[in-house]
Structure formats: C-alpha cells, structure tokens
Amino acid sequence: MGQQVGRVGEAPGLQQPQPRGIRGSSAARPSGRRRDPAGRTADAGFNVFTQHDHFASCVEDGFEGDKTGGSSPEVLHRPFGCDAESQALNEAIRWSSKENLLGATESDPNLFVALYDFVASGDNTLSITKGEKLRVLGYNQNGEWSEVRSKNGQGWVPSNYITPVNSLEKHSWYHGPVSRSAAEYLLSSLINGSFLVRESESSPGQLSISLRYEGRVYHYRINTTTDSKVYVTAESRFSTLAELVHHHSTVADGLVTTLHYPAPKCNKPTVYGVSPIHDKWEMERTDITMKHKLGGGQYGEVYVGVWKKYSLTVAVKTFKEDTMEVEEFLKEAAVMKEIKHPNLVQLLGVCTLEPPFYIVTEYMPYGNLLDYLRECSREEVTAVVLLYMATQISSAMEYLEKKNFIHRDLAARNCLVGENHVVKVADFGLSRLMTGDTYTAHAGAKFPIKWTAPESLAYNTFSIKSDVWAFGVLLWEIATYGMSPYPGIDLSQVYDLLEKGYRMEQPEGCPPKVYELMRACWKWSPADRPSFAETHQAFETMFHDSSISEEVAEELGRTASSSSVVPYLPRLPLLPSKTRTLRKQGENKENLDGGLDAAESLASSSAPAGFIRSTQASSGSPALPRKQRDKSPSSLLEDAKETCFTRDRKGGFFSSFMKKRNAPTPPKRSSSFREMENQPHKKYELTGNFSPVASLQNADGFSVAPSQQEPNLVPAKCYGGSFAQRNLCADDDSGGGGGSGTAGGGWSGITGFFTPRLIKKTLGLRAGKPTASDDTSKPFPRSNSTSSMSSGLPEQDRMAMTLPRNCQRSKLQLERTVSTSSQPEENVDRANDMLPKKSEEGAAPARERPKAKLLPRGATALPLRAPDPAITESDSPGVGVAGVAAAPKGKERNGGTRLGVAGVPEDGEQLGWSSPAKAVAVLPTTHNHKVPVLISPTLKHTPADVQLIGTDSQGNKFKLLSEHQVTSSGDKDRPRRVKPKCAPPPPPVMRLLQHPSTCSDPEEEPTAPPAGQHTPETQEGGKKAAPGPVPSSGKPGRPVMPPPQVPLPTSSISPAKMANGTAGTKVALRKTKQAAEKISADKISKEALLECADLLSSAITEPVPNSQLVDTGHQLLDYCSGYVDSIPQTRNKFAFREAVSKLELSLQELQVSSTAAGVPGTNPVLNNLLSCVQEISDVVQR
C-alpha cells in the first residue's frame, strides 16, 4: 500500500483491466474458504492467488511512491519479502482513497505507468521507478519486453512491470481476477475494514468488493447502469470506480463497514529471459554467485545462487559432464524456455558454453512438495491448503496440456513450494513436446514405476493422459501428507496389482469428490481418464459449490462430539456460519453476494488428516500390506478397550508413521482358529447405509449392526474392512448397489478409510458379544500374512496382505489377492452380486466327517453335494480351481442360478465378501495366474479334516486347511511354509463340449460345502435378496485396453460359455484353470514358442474349423504360460502379458462366434487373433 503523492485521473466509466504481457491462468487460485490457522503469523503482504493484482500506485512525474512490490501470475518468489502484518497495516494506514480522483484523464493509449522499480542490467535496458510515467514505443518478438521512453532516457523494460495509465491495475486495491474464496484467503489475516476490488472468475467483467469485518468476509457486487455509472447501492452512483471506492471509504452506505485498508500486494513478477533480445538465454557464468548446496541427484546437483545483475536469489541446477549429453541437457532447457505459467518453475537462463552446465531457475524457498508435506505443521497446512495446492498443480498441467507438452515425471518430489503455499511444477528433464498423440521413449529409459501409467510401463508410450495418471498419484501423496504410494508393495508388484483392478485406498479424511477424481485419473484406458482442463475445473467447482472449512468442521465436529480422543485440538474462535444474519445489510440485500466465511469448528484448522472424510458411501481400495499402515478409523470409537491398538494423535498420523513404532505381536493362529470353531454363535454383519446423521459406528465410514437372529449382540467392530463396495469413479456409474446397502443386508457397501498405520495392526473382526463387558474374544488371524509366506518370494514383509478371515467360513481362501476390498474396475457389478448362501448349521458335522485324502497333483477336490444333472463329476475335472470346483458362472438361457466357489450358490442381487477364492473363480479379466503377486501362503502337514490342493501363481501346489478344522494341539495347527515345487508336465487335456443349460436353484436345493468345512448359518445366508438379472454382455465402459491377462488352458472353458454364446463376452465370467496344466519354464524354449505361434498363424490363414483354431490357440497359451517367467526384461514381460491377454480374449470371441472359420480378410475375429499372435512373436523376438 504505497502512499500516493500525486494523482492521476481516470477515464469516465468503469475501466476494465487491459491485457498486458503474458496473462496467466486462473488455475493458481484456490477456491476454498478458510481463515489462517491459529498460531501462524499471517503473511498479509503476500498475494498468491491473483494474476493481475499488480500493486497500483500512480504518481505524477517527479514524485515517487513507496517501494512496495506487487503480485502477478509470473511471481518470482524471493527468499525475502514483505514483512508481517505490521508493515501491511502501516502502509494500509497511509493509503488515501482520494489518490486517483484528481488529475487529467489520459487519452494516449501508449502512456503507461511503472508498477515496480526495475534496475537496468545491460542489453539496452532502462531503469525505472514505480509510479513513473512512460511512453511505450514497441515490444520485442514475444512481447515480454517493452521499449519505452521516460524522462531519464529510452530503453527496454519488462512488459509486466508497467501498465496503461488508465488501467485499474494501477490502483492499490484492485487485484484483478480473483475467486471469491481466494479473496477470503487474502483477507483472512487482516483487520476490520480490509478490502479489495476483484474481477469475478465465473463472470468475467463483473467486479465485486470483498470486505472483512468481525472475522467474516462480505462480498458486494458492483453494478453498472446503462449510462456507465457504477454503484453498490442504487442511491449512490458514480462515474468511475475510484469515486465509488472513495465514497465507501468515508461512509458505509449499505456496506457492513467502511473501506479502510486495501489488501496489500508485495511480490514483483518474474522477468522472463535474460534480456529483451529474443531467445537469448545464455548467461555469463560470472553473473552467478554460487552459495550452499540444496541437494543432488543422478545427473548433478542443485545450489542456491545469486544473480548479481538483479540481486536475485536463484536456483542453479548443475550437470556432470559424463552423465548427460549436451543435447539432452539443452532439451530440458528448451522445454523450459517455452513454458510461462505462474505454477511452473520459470527458467531464467543457462550456461552451456563450457562444463559444468548450468540451468538457472527461480528459487522456491520451501523446497520440494514431498518434504514440505512430511515436515509441515498440520495446523498450518489444512485441508483447504492441500486443496489449494492440488488446484495449482492442475492449473499448471492444464497449461502444459494446451501447449502439447508432457511432463512424464509428475510427482510431489518434482513440485516446489514458495511463499504462502504457492506450488510450482518443476523438473522437466523428461518433458517432451508432443508432435503426435503419444510419445515413445527410447529403449532402456527409466521411469518411476509407482507414478507411471500402465500403458507406459508396458509399451513405453506416453501421452498427456499418462500424466493424468501420475496426477492422481500426486493427489494421493498430497492427501496423505507425503506418504509413499502403494505403501508396502514392492515395485515389481505394482503393475500386476493394477491389472487386477487394484487401486489405492481412499486416504483418511479425503473428501469423496477428491477420491472420485483420483479414481478417474486411474482408469485403465487412457481415453477414459479426464483431461487436465476437466480436473482443474473440478477443483474450482469443489471450492465454489461447497465450503471445505465447513465440511472439515462438520466432519471433525461430529467425531469430536462422540469421542474423547481429540481433546487436544486448539480452541479457535468460531467464525459465523453462512446461516447467521448479516449485519447492516438490510438496505443492500440485492447486492450482497452472501456471507462467505464458513463456520469453523474448534478443530477445523488443525485436522490431523489432509482432507475430510465423507459420511456418504464412498469407494475404498483394498487393505494395504503390513509394512505401512495408519491409525485405525475405529480409534475414535468410545470403547477404547476394544481397539487393537492406541496411538497419540497429537502429532498427526504421518508423524506417528515416521516414528516407526513396532507393531504388536500378532495373535496365534491356532487359538484364533479354535476360537472361531468353538464359538460358532458369533454373528457378524456390517451394513453400508450411510447418512449425514450417522451413528458413532458410522463415523469411520461403515456401520456395524448385530445379527437379527441375536438382537442382543452389541455392534461388532471392524478394524480393516472395506469389503465389497462400490467404486465411485466414473466408470462405476453403472455398478450395482454399493455403499447404500441392499435389502439383504450382509456385507454390503463397506467403505472405511484405510491408512497404513491401521493395517499395521492385526486386521480382524470383533465379534458381537452377549455382554458388552466380555472382552475375551481375539481378533481373527491374518489369513495371508508374512509369517506364512512362501520362502521363495522376495520382500515377504512387503508383499504379504493382511486379510480378515471369513467369519462365515463358507468359502476357501485359495489365492493371495490384493485385498478383500479391492474391486476391479470392470467387475464392480459382479463384485456386488456375490454373497454366500445360507450354509449348514453347527460345528459337530464337521468333526464327524471322515478326513479326505490328499489328492494327487492335477486332480481337484470336488465339494460334497447331491448329484446334479447339470454338473457331474465326470464333466468337471478341468473346472476346479485350486481344489475347488467352480460351477458355471453366468446365468444360463433357462434362468439357472450361478454357483459360487465351493459349490455355494450365489445370488445375483446380493452383495458379498469378495474373498480371494471368489476372485479366482469369478473375475477373469483381473487376475493373472502367472503373476507372483500376494499369493496365498504355502501350507504343509496340517491335521485338517480335509486337505485341499491349491496353486500359487507359478503353478506350484500347496495344501490348504479346511475352514473349520478341529484342533487338537497348538503347534500342529499352525501352518508351515514349504518351498514351492515345480509342477509336472500337464496331463492330457479334457474338454467339456456339452452341458445342460440349467443348474439347481439354490432356494430349493442348498449345496453342501467341501468335506471338513464347517459352515455355520449366518445372517447373510438368511437374508438373501431375490436373484437379479445377470448382464449378458460386458460392462459398459469397459477399458479399450483390457488388463493384461495370462492365458488359461482349454480345459478351463466353462460349459456355460459354450451353451450361451452371449456369455462369452461377459467381463465377470471366470474361466478356471486346472493347476496341473502349468508348463514349467524350463520345458518351453523360445524356438518352441515361436514354432507354436507360426503353427497358429498358418492355421488361421487356412479354412479350418473354429474348434481346431481354439485348440491350437490354447496350446499357444499354455506355451506362453510357461515362457513368461523366462523373459528377462520387465518391460518386455509386461508387453508379453498384455499380448497374451489379447490372445485369450480373441480365442474367447472365436469360441463363441457362430461365423465359420474363413480367411483373416473376411473374418474380423480371425484378423484380431492373427494380430495377437504376431504381437506375441514380436515381443518374444525382441
């Protein structure tokens, strides 16, 4: 707020801001309502939102105003800046509302005024002083420099340092295009009477006054009459905006108070380029003084330096001579020369004449975003700040998208933080200018796997949509205050998890809308992901449509009202809510935009988590591995005794994570097994019916209710369960009933917020107890934990998944999957369709059944059930999966009901626990049998009533305990690890060609579980909903690029697929695999595989029956299954799996095709099949 000595007139009428220089994007401005958290010194002088908020102080010739800088989209944040509140207040006091009322109106369009001081540095530049009048003579080629004449001479000055003399930007109170929430942010730390005039973002050209009074910010629309008069109240109209501001600075006249102190603007804009000479970026090395080192990397180091010409602190990126070619180094510099955006780190110059090479950029004093998030104060960096940061990054990426650039390394570590939470995207070493739709990286290029899109990992191809994927991961980093993505998951497992449909869980406290955006960014098909323009608009909409502060206050207030865990939260003054009556607005109701400061609760500015939690049904991703977990959502429950662990929330969840506390000793499996067997009376039911007035059990994303059969049971508590649920991303719009629950109850729509510390503890279920004081029950054992991992798998502690045991014991968990809660994108409907039917009652029958003998390799364990004409033992040797016979999955033509794993009928409308076994038997497009990802532990020598044979991803056999075995001793019941053994060569293939099209109705003929399996009756079985229709085709919106799928042998073709042609295209159909058909890698050579591929290619080109082509194709699939693990390079392995997946899908289409085999030119199915075979051959020959 510089004091105005001279006065410059203003043209009549409302003056609109004139474009000047490079206009930035509005993306850098947040749109959330917030007030500065307590305890933080408000940097009142910094304006970090607006693009055209240059400090206006126009004085007559010979007079000089204060040297206070301004803010602009091209802000170069210096390590120093405006002082704190005192300086802003002192300068505000000196402001005179009459500063621009007098003086002649200038009609010369070339007459400009200086906004900032500028010191000449050679190259014919001219020194100017703020407030000095200048006449513009011309511009350089890119318009970033203006040639001007002043009383001191003629020369070049930066274009963004001057403005037309009649522009609104000369005024100290005019801030240009600023959103409503950004204005509130600017005024939040100021005093009563602080104000600014801004242009509306949503309605360009519409001006408003934002005025702070008594902790609130009021917004008044400035109206314009037909005769160009401006007014706030209809009784007081003025010719110019300056007159209006002057009037309301003396009398309120309808405003809540008078206009006293313009909000300050203190940062100078960035000077683009070294000089006005176009494309001159080479700097003199002697102009840079190197200071201390900031950090180092693979290619060089980064230092703090001073650009002596401008006395400007800069960042200097150096490169080692032997690590990077000069051309590659210049490519990065060339990319940075072309980008100019307030949220992109600006290139200032380069030194490339001799090594070591320098890239000189603006300096961001707070370092990279990742470290900043990990070390910041949660009281300062609140949910609003996090959302603001994400908005800025989306704005920068939208700019790159429009410029047709790809970044290729977007992550929190490559974003830098400046004053007042300004974030800028940096590190353009991998960025490229796109000349087509995609960019293919050279062989051997390295990429950050956890941030790289699947198509980029598989094919080395990049597009702006692969940056969108990385942006979704970056959002997850922001929401978790800098946690590492996919915590506890090894790099080699990430791609395999993604192809199974796994996506990271919803961070604790993350609003559903933000998580929906993350999931949209993680769509498998690039075409299905949103553009950065859409993501940026989505963030802006979030700010405008709702108050984040109010959501934080509402969510945390609800939790605090029911919990005694959060008494430490600081008692901040409560701000008035929107519903409170506005003061002094009776005579100005038509112009008041509305009360804008959201009411904040005592906890709103100190939320330990990044974003707020939702009380509505939201999508959660699977439970995470044990290596990294966060606090349990149930830590806020009143009954602290029943939680598996406690923790101090005072430091925020991430600080607790960094302490690396040791997890408690997990419960013994034997006792847990006995507990579940000996206490069959315990029932569990979790419902997903959420409402804004959720009960205490709902506070963490799910509710727990006792079984209807036993109403006296207290609600069970679940520490880790987001089970069958509905994903909220765009591709799940057609999904079945997710979080809203179903008529049948049961495991329906569980969401819950899983964090690394939560799952670091034992994942399990607390059973309902007849009395609340009975605390003797123990958590369920981790069914797939590291203690029973196969010794042959690396990173055991990171790869194992902690899964709750199935309390119904109606299914066998035969395979390690990502989580019980992970639902593949393409199969959400099917995941919601699965629920175990009512099972046999009592535990005694399980003890009375004779033990089943260990089955030989290649055989399958069939469930003990009544003979079914639809499924006979002779028909099904190839149908079983790892020892469980899976009946045809798909509704048949005659309306038969689908049978689930272990012969348990499934209801089409009910939601069920998507157990690992079910994932094997039902979800074909999301599981890769050849990928060693989180697979079930190897068990040996178990005294189970029945021993079933399972297979891991390598085709190795292992034995499984029955679900409810009778335990006689502790140690004997504990599963033991055995080293996997290679499977023998496959036996002759048996095919099922005919099969009846119906199967028994589960309501009329309940099926029995496998021998030795105890299946107590549960509420889920008793509350079956009516069967619903099964879709006859793939789910709408199925990704263009299906997840890579390792082939399945011909014997695994379900008879339902042959009986029903349309069923062949179902996404949710599961082709099961006979374990013994795995061909070991040492028996498949490259030559044999290529020979088999040539054989299939030859068969395709000849008129042969479809059945013969299918046989040959499945033979090739078997060869591929055995060969995939011998591919040395990871990227080639990814591409190979993708090609094999396409081949498998092509064979399925051929199998159900009614068209007779012909030549590839006439049959599109054959064309597709031939291209798949060729792609496999190409990958193998690389």
Curated annotation (Swiss-Prot):
Lineage, highest ranks first: Eukaryota, Metazoa, Chordata, Craniata, Vertebrata
Function: Non-receptor tyrosine-protein kinase that plays an ABL1-overlapping role in key processes linked to cell growth and survival such as cytoskeleton remodeling in response to extracellular stimuli, cell motility and adhesion, receptor endocytosis, autophagy, DNA damage response and apoptosis. Coordinates actin remodeling through tyrosine phosphorylation of proteins controlling cytoskeleton dynamics like MYH10 (involved in movement); CTTN (involved in signaling); or TUBA1 and TUBB (microtubule subunits).
GO biological process: actin cytoskeleton organization; actin filament bundle assembly; actin filament organization; adult walking behavior; aggressive behavior; alpha-beta T cell differentiation; auditory behavior; Bergmann glial cell differentiation
UniProt note on tissues of expression: Most abundant in adult mouse brain, especially in synapse-rich regions.
Predominant location: cytoplasm
Residues reported in the UniProt entry to bind ATP: 294-302, 317, 362-368
Organism, scientific name: Mus musculus (Mouse)
Subunit annotation: Interacts with PSMA7. Interacts with CTTN. Found in a complex with ABL1, ABL2, CRK and UNC119; leading to the inhibition of CRK phosphorylation by ABL kinases.
Keywords attached to this entry: Acetylation, ATP-binding, Cell adhesion, Cytoplasm, Cytoskeleton, Kinase, Lipoprotein, Magnesium, Manganese, Metal-binding, Myristate, Nucleotide-binding, Phosphoprotein, SH2 domain, SH3 domain, Transferase, Tyrosine-protein kinase, Ubl conjugation
Gene that this sequence comes from: Abl2
Protein name: Tyrosine-protein kinase ABL2
Modified residues (Phosphothreonine): 802
UniProt GO cellular component terms: actin cytoskeleton; cytoplasmic vesicle; dendritic spine; glutamatergic synapse; lamellipodium; phagocytic cup; postsynapse
Entry PTM: Phosphorylated at Tyr-261 by ABL1 in response to oxidative stress. Phosphorylated by PDGFRB. Polyubiquitinated. Polyubiquitination of ABL2 leads to degradation.
